[in-house]
Amino acid sequence: MKTLLYKQLRLVCQPMTLVFCLFGVMLLIPAYPYTVMWFYVMLGLFFSFLNGREQKNVYYSALLPIRKRDTVKANCLFVGLIELLALVIAVPFALLRAKLGIGDNPVGLNANVTLFACGLMLFAVFNAVFLLSFYRTAYKVGVSFVKACIVMAVAAFIMEAVVHFPALSRFNGYDLACQLPLLAAGLVIWCGSWPLIFRGAAARYEKVDL
């Protein structure tokens, strides 16, 4: 599996995917819907999957002495690694924003723990829709991405909006007692979704006639 993941990183990973992981710097923008930062990470993943298709990675992998589900597992590990990398890189920028004394974000979520919890949840939503759709054919990258983006955009809009309701405004502050349980929930959702996504995607890919 390590070899397959290495193949994904060396042959499939599009350079812009790694560039978009650096977009945590957007947290230094004073007024901006910060969930867009997570969208760029997903866009980077789309570019890598598109690159894999154009490089005939699916057919190359099919020629290797491995099971189809191993290919799916390697892709899932690749996606998870990129998402974790983006989250980790964004943390120093959130801390720097606080150090610089930049005020609250008037257009949505602040650069706080809740934002990272929402990022994990959005990634889980994107992964479920995108990967399950993609592995129906292992070819239609664009259609799968559009489907995932529509669902993700609705979820992101709700997340950006609900914190403006007085009853939920505490989640948009900086009270860790309120936000750490939300982060834990996001982590559980993200981690817990992977076995389901993998099994579903692998089952669909097994039925694809290459």
PLM regions and their residue ranges:
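Hydrophobic alpha-helical transmembrane segments of membrane proteins
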Residues: 1-58, 74-210
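Short helix-to-coil transition segments within interhelical loops
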Residues: 63-68
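Alpha-helix N-cap/helix-start motif at helix boundaries, enriched for small hydrophobics
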Residues: 70-72
